[in-house]
Structures are given as structure tokens and as C-alpha cells.
Amino acid sequence: MASPRTVTIVALSFALGLFFVFMGTIKLTPRLSKDAYSEMKRAYKSYAKALPALKKMGVSSVLLRKIIGTLEVGCGIVLTLVPGRPKDVANFILLLVMLAVLFFHQLVGDPLKRYAHALVFGILLTCRLLIARQAEDRPEREERREEQINAQEKNKVKVS
């Protein structure tokens, strides 16, 4: 039977992956929801206006939206389907994207209800990453503990 930690990581990875594939697709195409796509276009225009440095670098609102949408779709697919270390990398990239999105929302002065999802999913990504890292560190700690116990037993003096 799988450990609770493994079940948690798999469930979080799958759910987060599907969410980011969905949200990234909404940013890239109006096929899923024309209203949501239009709202994304409007929001990213306001983000680009609030950051004139992006315009100086040649990053338009369309390019910014497509970059973030593509990152979300790509990393979402990795979180959903790819096993191993790439999930942690995708998780970290998505965490950075969520931080950028939170920054954009704060920059334009959006109310909390507009960016609460980014906050929640940022927390979930952080939890998933911490749980995954904790699971990897545990066998090493147990081995070190066993070595310390063995060393202590060898150093004990038998009293007769």
C-alpha cells in the first residue's frame, strides 16, 4: 500500500496539473470560454500598462499572456503526467509564475477576490514541493540515525 505522503503528492500533482493546463489554455485560446479569454486579455493589458519596463524590453501584453499561458500548460502537463524530478522543476516554475501573477495583481490594485486563486494555488504548490522534498530527505535521515545508533552501540562498554 502506498504511503499517505505518496498519495498526497500524486493527488496534488494531478489536481494542480489539470488546473494549470486549464488556466493556461484559457489564456491561450477562446475555445474553452470566450468570456474568460476576453477577461484574460483585458487583465494582461492592464499588467503591461502598469509595467512600462516590459514595453521597453519588447514584451507586449499578448506576448506576456502567451508566455505565462504556455508555461502553465507545459508545467501542468509535466505535473500531471511526468514522474520524478521534472515535477519538482515544473512545480517551482509554476510557483514563480504565481508570485509574478500576485505581483501583477498588486501592481494594478486588484481586490483580493481577483487574485485569491493565485494565492491559494501558490500555497498548494508550496505544500506539494515541501511534501515532495520531505519524502526525499527521510531515507537519508533514517540511514544516518541507524549509523549513529550502531556507532553508539560499538562504543558502549560491557559491564559484567
Curated annotation (Swiss-Prot):
GO terms for cellular component: cytoplasmic vesicle; endoplasmic reticulum; endoplasmic reticulum membrane; peroxisomal membrane. Its main location: membrane. The keyword Endoplasmic reticulum applies. GO terms for molecular function: acetylcholine receptor regulator activity. Belongs to the DoxX family. It comes from the Eukaryota. The keyword Transmembrane applies. Keywords: Chaperone, Cytoplasmic vesicle, Endoplasmic reticulum, Membrane, Peroxisome, Transmembrane, Transmembrane helix. It comes from Danio rerio (Zebrafish). Molecular chaperone which mediates the proper assembly and functional expression of the nicotinic acetylcholine receptors (nAChRs) throughout the brain. Essential for the proper folding, assembly, function and surface trafficking of alpha-7 (CHRNA7), alpha-4-beta-2, alpha-3-beta-2 and alpha-3-beta-4 receptors. Residues 137-160 are annotated as: Disordered. GO terms for biological process: chaperone-mediated protein complex assembly; positive regulation of protein localization to cell surface. Residues 27-61, 110-113 are lumenal. Residues 1-5, 83-88, 132-160 are cytoplasmic. This is Novel acetylcholine receptor chaperone. PANTHER family: NOVEL ACETYLCHOLINE RECEPTOR CHAPERONE (PTHR13163:SF0), SPINAL CORD EXPRESSION PROTEIN 4 (PTHR13163). It is found in: Peroxisome membrane; Cytoplasmic vesicle; Endoplasmic reticulum membrane. It is a multi-pass membrane protein. The chain crosses the membrane at residues 6-26, 62-82, 89-109, 114-131.
